[in-house]
C-alpha cells in the first residue's frame, strides 16, 4: 500500500535520530516523522503552487503543537482537549521560523505552511531540536525553492565542558542553554541563556554547536537524495531594470538627504513624501504601473542608500559613529503605588517597567508534556501601537511580544535570587512606550532597575544591547545600539544581555551567509563595551537592591512547625487556616516539611497570625491554666477551647464549687472562661476544670485567713 517509504537513521551525540517519510500524510507537499530516542514529532509542509497575484510578501506560517497524548495524559479543564498555543509552543514555533525564513528566495511569494505536532515524548529529550531537524528534512524533500537544509543543536556548559544536546536533567546543572541553527556554511540563528559566561565561552559554544550539527545536515542531504522529489519548476521573475533606473533617478538623491534627518518621525514623514512624489510621477507616465512593485523597488533603494553610506564610513542615520550608544535617561521609583518601577530611555526607545511582589501562591503553574513545574519569576512585555506612532488592534499578546518577553527574562534569570533566599513570586511588566530599535534590550535594563527599586536582591545589574551588521563583499561594519531602520536594512540582529562579569543571554538572527567567527568576535567585544557603558549609567541611578521592600508589598514571615502539627493548623476541611486568613487579613502557605509562610502588608496582622499558629501548635500542659471559649453545652458539662481549636471537656462537677443542676445556668456558648488542665488521656482527650482554675487564680478569703493564723 505504501509505495516508497524512506527511513534514515543516524547517531547524533548520545541520541539516535530517525527520519521517515512515505507512510503518513501523503497528500501533503512533504511530511516527515522525526524521532530522537522516544521523542517523536510529525512535521508536514504544504506549499501552494501559485502565488496570489500582486502579493508583495512571503506568507510563511509555522505552527507547533504539543499533544497531551504524547505523554500519556488527558488535558485538564472542562473541554478536555488542547486549546490555543501555550507560551512554550509559541516560542518553539518562533525558534523553527527564524532560521528557515531567510533561506527562501526573496522573490518566492507562494504560501507555505509548516505544521509540527509532538506525538510522543521522552521527558528527558526536549522536542524542540528534533522538531527543527524534522522541519529541515520536510522542506528538503518538498521540492520547493529552499536554500537548506539546516541543522540544529543544543549546547550545554557542564563542569567546564561543552555538551551536545544535554538531557533535561543535565541542563539543571548547566551554566548554558544555547540553541544554534545554520546551514553547512553559516550560522543563521542563536538563542541562549547563560550564567555569566565570557564572550569567548559563548562564541566557542556557538562554533561547537555549528560544527556538531554538520552530521544532521549531511544526513538530511542523504535522506533527500533517496526520496528524490522533483524540484519545482519555479524561476524568479526578471528584474525590471528600466523601472529600477527610473525610481533611482527620481528618488536616490532625495533619499540621501532624507536619511540625514536624525529625528525618526520627521525622517519618516519626508520619506513618505518622496514615495508619494515618485508614485505621482510614475502614474502620470504610465497609468498601468504596478505600485506594489514600485513600493518594493523604492524600499530596496532605501536599503542601498543606507548601507552604502554606512560602508563608506559616514555617520549613521541619527548622526552617531558605529560604536556609539544613544543618550540614556534612567529613573527609578516613577510610580507611587507599585512595588518597584523604572523608566529607561535610550534615544527614541523607552520602557516603563514595573515589578510586583506576590506570595508563592501567585506562582505560575506550568503543566507541560515534560511535567508540572512552578515559575516564581514572570516577565511580560507589551508593545502597544502608540509606541511607534500608529493605531492598531490591542488584545492578547502576539508571538513577537511573547518572544521579546522571553528574551528579556533569559537576560535577568541568572541574577535572580532563589526562592529560598527571597520567598516571593515576582512579576515584571515592561510597557514599551516608545520604540526605535532594541526595545527588548531596553526591557532588560528597565527590569534590572525596577527589581532593585522593589528591593529584590538580584546578584548584579543587567543591561542589554542590540548590535547590527552591514556587510558588502569583504567590507563590513558592526553597529552598536541599532535603530529600527538599521535592524530592518542590515544583515544581522545580535542582542546581548549581561552583567559586568559576563553574558546572561544572547540572541542572534543572521540574514546572509558569510558571517565568520571573526565578525561574531568583533560584535561580541563591541557589545561588551556598550553594555558596560550602560551599566555604569544605570549604577549611578541605583546600584543595588533597596534595603526595604515597598510599604505596599506583602511582607513574608517564615516559621517552622512540626510536620505532625500541619493537620491542626489546616483543620477539618481547611476550616482553621481559612479562619486564620480571614480574621488576620493574611495569606498563609504551608509546606509539607512544616514550613509556614505568612504574607501580610501590616506587621501587626502577621504577628497575630504567628501568635495564633503558635497557640494552635503548642502542646497542652497538665496543670496549666488557659483562656478559652465555650463551644458546646451538653447535659454533663461543656466543651471549651484550649490553645486555639483544641477542645477539652469541663465536667458539670468541675464548673463551680457548689453542686449545679443545669450547665446552661452557669455557662453560655461563646463565653470566655479560664480552665485548668486536669488530665490528658491516652487518646489525647483533655479534661478541664473551671472550678480549680478559679480557686488557683482567686484564693478564698477563708483560706487566706487560715494561712495567716
Swiss-Prot record:
CDD domains attached to this UniProt entry: KH-I_PNPase, RNase_PH_PNPase_1, RNase_PH_PNPase_2, S1_PNPase
SMART domains: KH (SM00322), S1 (SM00316)
A GO molecular-function descriptor: magnesium ion binding
UniProt domain S1 motif: residue ranges: 623-691
Domain KH: 554-613
Keyword tags: Cytoplasm, Magnesium, Metal-binding, Nucleotidyltransferase, RNA-binding, Transferase
Enzyme Commission no: 2.7.7.8
Top-rank lineage group of the source organism: Bacteria
Binding site for Mg(2+): 487, 493
Cofactor(s) in the UniProt record: Mg(2+)
Any one GO CC term of the record: cytosol
Record localization: Cytoplasm
Pfam families from the UniProt entry: KH_1, PNPase, RNase_PH, RNase_PH_C, S1
Any one Gene Ontology BP term: RNA processing
Subunit structure: Component of the RNA degradosome, which is a multiprotein complex involved in RNA processing and mRNA degradation.
Function: Involved in mRNA degradation. Catalyzes the phosphorolysis of single-stranded polyribonucleotides processively in the 3'- to 5'-direction.
Name listed for the protein in its UniProt record: Polyribonucleotide nucleotidyltransferase
Amino acid at each position: 500500500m505504501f509505495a516508497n517509504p524512506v527511513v534514515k537513521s543516524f547517531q547524533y551525540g548520545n541520541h539516535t535520530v530517525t527520519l521517515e517519510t512515505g507512510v503518513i500524510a501523503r497528500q501533503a507537499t512533504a511530511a516527515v516523522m522525526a524521532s530522537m530516542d522516544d521523542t517523536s514529532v510529525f512535521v508536514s509542509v504544504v506549499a501552494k503552487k501559485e502565488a496570489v497575484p500582486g502579493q508583495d510578501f512571503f506568507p510563511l506560517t509555522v505552527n507547533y503543537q504539543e499533544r497531551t497524548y504524547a505523554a500519556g495524559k488527558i488535558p485538564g479543564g472542562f473541554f478536555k482537549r488542547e486549546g490555543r498555543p501555550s507560551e512554550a509552543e509559541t516560542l518553539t514555533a518562533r525558534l523553527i521560523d527564524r532560521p528557515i525564513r531567510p533561506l527562501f528566495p526573496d522573490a518566492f511569494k507562494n504560501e507555505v505552511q509548516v505544521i509540527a505536532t509532538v506525538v510522543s515524548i521522552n521527558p528527558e529529550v526536549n522536542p524542540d531540536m528534533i522538531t527543527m531537524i524534522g522541519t529541515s528534512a520536510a522542506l528538503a524533500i518538498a521540492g520547493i525553492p529552499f536554500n537548506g537544509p539546516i541543522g540544529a543543536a543544543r549546547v550545554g556548559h557542564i563542569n567546564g565542558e561543552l555538551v551536545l544536546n544535554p538531557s533535561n536533567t543535565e541542563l539543571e546543572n548547566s551554566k548554558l542553554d544555547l540553541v544554534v541553527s545554520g546551514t553547512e556554511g553559516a550560522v543563521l540563528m542563536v538563542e541562549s541563556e547563560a550564567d555569566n559566561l565570557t564572550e569567548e565561552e559563548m562564541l566557542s559554544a556557538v562554533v561547537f554547536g555549528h560544527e556538531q550539527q554538520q552530521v544532521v545536515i549531511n544526513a538530511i542531504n542523504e535522506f533527500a537524495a533517496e526520496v528524490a522529489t522533483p524540484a519545482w519548476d519555479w524561476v524568479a521573475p526578471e528584474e525590471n531594470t528600466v523601472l529600477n533606473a527610473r525610481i533611482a533617478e527620481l528618488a536616490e538623491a532625495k533619499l540621501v538627504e532624507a536619511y540625514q534627518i536624525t529625528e525618526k518621525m520627521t525622517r519618516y514623514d519626508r520619506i513618505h513624501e518622496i514615495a508619494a512624489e515618485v508614485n505621482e510621477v510614475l502614474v502620470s507616465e504610465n497609468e498601468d504601473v504596478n505600485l506594489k512593485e514600485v513600493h518594493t523597488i523604492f524600499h530596496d533603494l532605501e536599503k542601498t542608500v543606507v548601507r552604502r553610506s554606512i560602508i563608506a564610513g559616514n555617520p549613521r542615520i541619527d548622526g552617531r559613529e558605529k560604536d556609539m550608544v544613544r543618550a540614556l535617561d534612567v529613573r527609578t521609583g516613577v510610580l507611587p503605588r507599585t512595588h518597584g518601577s523604572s523608566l529607561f530611555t535610550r534615544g527614541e526607545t523607552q520602557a516603563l517597567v514595573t515589578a510586583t511582589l506576590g506570595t508563592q501562591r501567585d506562582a505560575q503553574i506550568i503543566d507541560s508534556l515534560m511535567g508540572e513545574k512552578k515559575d516564581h519569576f514572570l516577565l511580560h512585555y507589551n508593545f502597544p501601537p502608540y509606541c511607534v506612532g500608529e493605531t492598531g488592534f490591542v488584545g492578547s499578546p502576539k508571538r513577537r511580544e511573547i518572544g521579546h518577553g522571553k528574551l528579556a527574562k533569559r537576560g535577568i534569570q541568572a541574577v535572580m535570587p532563589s526562592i529560598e533566599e527571597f520567598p516571593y513570586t515576582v512579576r515584571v511588566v515592561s510597557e514599551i512606550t516608545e520604540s526605535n530599535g532594541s526595545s527588548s534590550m531596553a526591557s532588560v535594563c528597565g527590569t534590572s532597575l525596577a527589581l532593585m527599586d522593589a528591593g529584590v536582591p538580584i546578584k548584579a545589574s543587567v543591561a542589554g544591547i542590540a548590535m547590527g551588521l552591514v556587510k558588502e563583499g569583504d567590507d563590513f561594519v558592526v553597529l552598536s545600539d541599532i535603530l529600527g531602520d538599521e535592524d530592518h536594512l542590515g544583515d544581522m540582529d545580535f542582542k546581548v544581555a549581561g552583567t559586568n562579569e559576563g553574558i546572561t543571554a544572547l540572541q542572534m538572527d543572521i540574514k546572509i551567509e558569510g558571517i565568520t567567527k571573526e565578525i561574531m568576535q568583533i560584535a561580541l567585544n563591541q557589545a561588551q563595551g556598550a553594555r558596560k557603558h550602560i551599566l555604569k549609567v544605570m549604577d549611578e541611578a541605583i546600584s543595588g537592591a533597596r534595603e526595604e521592600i515597598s510599604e505596599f508589598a506583602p511582607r513574608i514571615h517564615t516559621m517552622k512547625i512540626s510536620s505532625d502539627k500541619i493537620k491542626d493548623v489546616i483543620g477539618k476541611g481547611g476550616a482553621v487556616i481559612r479562619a486564620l486568613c480571614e480574621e488576620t487579613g493574611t495569606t498563609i502557605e504551608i509546606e509539607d516539611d512544616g514550613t509556614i509562610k505568612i504574607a501580610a502588608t501590616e506587621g501587626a496582622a502577621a504577628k497575630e497570625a504567628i501568635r495564633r499558629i503558635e497557640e494552635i501548635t503548642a502542646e497542652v500542659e497538665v496543670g496549666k491554666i488557659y483562656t478559652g471559649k465555650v463551644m458546646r453545652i451538653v447535659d454533663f458539662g461543656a466543651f471549651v477551647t484550649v490553645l486555639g481549636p483544641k477542645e477539652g471537656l469541663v465536667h458539670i462537677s468541675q464548673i463551680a464549687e457548689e453542686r449545679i443542676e443545669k450547665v446552661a445556668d452557669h455557662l453560655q456558648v461563646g463565653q470566655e472562661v479560664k480552665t485548668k488542665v486536669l488530665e490528658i488521656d491516652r487518646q489525647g482527650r483533655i479534661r478541664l476544670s473551671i472550678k480549680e482554675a478559679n480557686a488557683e487564680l482567686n484564693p478564698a478569703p477563708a483560706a487566706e485567713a487560715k494561712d495567716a493564723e
